[in-house]
Every structure is written in structure tokens, then in C-alpha cells.
Amino acid sequence: MAIKSMMHIRSAFLLFVLLLTACLGTPQPSDSGIEGTVAVGPMCPVMQANVPCPDQPYQATLTVLTTSGKKVLQFQTDEKGRFRVNLASGDYILHPESPNVMPSAADMPFTVAEHKFTMLEISYDSGIR
């Protein structure tokens, strides 16, 4: 009787491990994805000739969607607006999140090729005019 009980426990444990492994999902490849920078501008209320007013790096939250709108992942850039994220090859949409009405940025479709990183530059509009 004890041997039969041990076999049931072992079977239940193996089933648990298999189900847990299945729930973890497919790991993202490490040799393809997206990388780039995020900036916000304009930063000066009135642009003047010979007075530089470059866009500034912007720490943003970005969401990657499938072309049908399903969320793949969400991540945050570093304080200098830089990011590098692993993704499987395919077609996606990058949705820049906005904490308020401004700054805002448009969705950006992109493609990831096998074994390559796609470079993206995202520009948020500050709303300053």
C-alpha cells in the first residue's frame, strides 16, 4: 500500500513540474529584438536662430504589441532614454505610453529579423510651442 501511495505522489509531482514548465512560456531569443533611444522635444518655448535647443533624452514606458494588438511585453527605458529588448523575429507595433496628455508619441510599426536587432528612435512631442 505504501509503494502505491509513493507512486501516486511521484506521479503528481512530475505532473506538477510539467505543468509549471509549460506555464513559464517560451523564452525570448537573445540574438534578436529592438534597441534604440527615446527623446522629447521641443524643449524651448520659442525657437530662435543660432540658439540651440536640442531634444532631450526621455525615460519612457514602452509597450510592444502584435500587429493584432495583443500585448507582448512592456518595459522602461533607462534615464538616458536607451533600451535593448529581446524579441522573436516578426512584425510588431511599439506603443509609447504617456503618463498625461503630453508628452505623447505615435505608435510605430516595426519588424524584427532573425538574429538581428532593429534600431528604433522614438520622439515624444513635449507640447511646448
Segment roles from a protein language model:
Residues 2-13:
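Bacterial N-terminal signal peptides that target proteins for export
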Residues 99-125:
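Structured interaction patches on ligand/partner-binding surfaces of diverse proteins
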Residues 67-80:
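Short, acidic Ser/Thr/Gly-rich low-complexity loop/linker segments typical of extracellular
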Residues 40-68:
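Short, ordered, surface-exposed loop/turn motifs in non-cytosolic proteins
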Residues 36, 77-85:
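Glycine-centered loop-to-beta-strand initiation motif
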Residues 90-100:
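A short, solvent-exposed beta-strand micro-motif common in secreted/extracellular proteins
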Residues 20-22:
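C-terminal motif of bacterial Sec signal peptides marking the signal peptidase cleavage site
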Residues 24-27:
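Bacterial signal peptide processing site
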